C-alpha cells in the first residue's frame, strides 16, 4: 500500500489492515483478496468520516496486489470511504498531471500489456513530469507473480532517469 496524507493515520490504518488480513487468513484459511482489503480500509475511513467525536483519516490509499490467479490489481480509497479499481493511478501532490500522463500513455484494454521494464519506465516518466528526475526523489517497488516485492535500487532508478532524459 502507498498513501498520501498524514503518516500517523496511515500507520493506524495499515496496522488495522494487517490485523484484519491475519484474522481473515485464520478464519477462512486463504489470503484475502486485494479488493477485500481495499474495501476494509475504505470502510475504516468511512466510519471515521461519519462518526462523531473522531476526526476523519487524512489519507488516500493506493492498494496493489495480485489476485489468486496472479493478475495484478490496483485499488484506491479516499478519506470519504470511496474505493475504486484502477489500471494505473497516482495520488498526492501533482496527482492531476501524473494521472493525465498515465491516461495518455498507458495501453488501452485489448492492447499489448506493458513489460516489467516498460511499466517501470512509464511510472518513472510520469513522476519526472512533476518532480526532479533523480533517484533521490523517486522510489519504485515492483510486484510480480511468484516473487517478493522488490524495491529498485537508487542506481537502477537513476539509470532509467538517465535513459528518459536522453530521449
List each model region and its residues.
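Long, low-complexity N-terminal extensions
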Residues: 1-167
Amino acid at each position: 500500500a502507498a498513501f498520501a496524507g498524514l503518516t500517523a493515520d496511515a500507520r493506524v490504518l495499515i496496522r488495522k489492515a494487517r490485523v484484519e488480513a491475519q484474522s481473515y487468513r485464520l478464519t477462512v484459511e486463504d489470503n484475502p483478496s486485494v479488493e477485500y482489503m481495499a474495501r476494509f480500509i475504505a470502510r475504516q475511513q468511512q466510519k471515521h468520516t461519519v462518526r462523531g467525536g473522531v476526526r476523519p483519516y487524512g489519507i488516500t490509499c493506493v492498494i496493489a496486489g495480485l489476485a489468486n490467479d496472479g493478475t495484478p490489481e490496483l485499488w484506491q480509497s479516499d478519506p470519504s470511504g470511496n474505493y475504486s479499481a484502477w489500471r494505473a493511478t497516482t495520488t498526492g501532490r501533482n496527482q492531476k498531471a501524473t494521472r493525465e500522463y498515465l491516461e495518455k500513455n498507458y495501453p488501452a484494454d485489448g492492447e499489448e500489456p506493458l513489460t516489467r521494464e516498460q511499466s517501470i519506465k512509464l511510472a518513472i516518466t510520469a513522476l519526472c513530469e512533476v518532480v526532479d528526475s533523480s533517484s533521490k526523489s523517486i522510489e519504485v517497488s515492483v510486484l510480480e507473480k511468484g516473487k517478493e516485492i522488490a524495491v529498485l535500487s537508487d542506481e537502477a532508478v537513476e539509470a532509467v532517469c538517465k535513459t528518459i532524459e536522453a530521449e
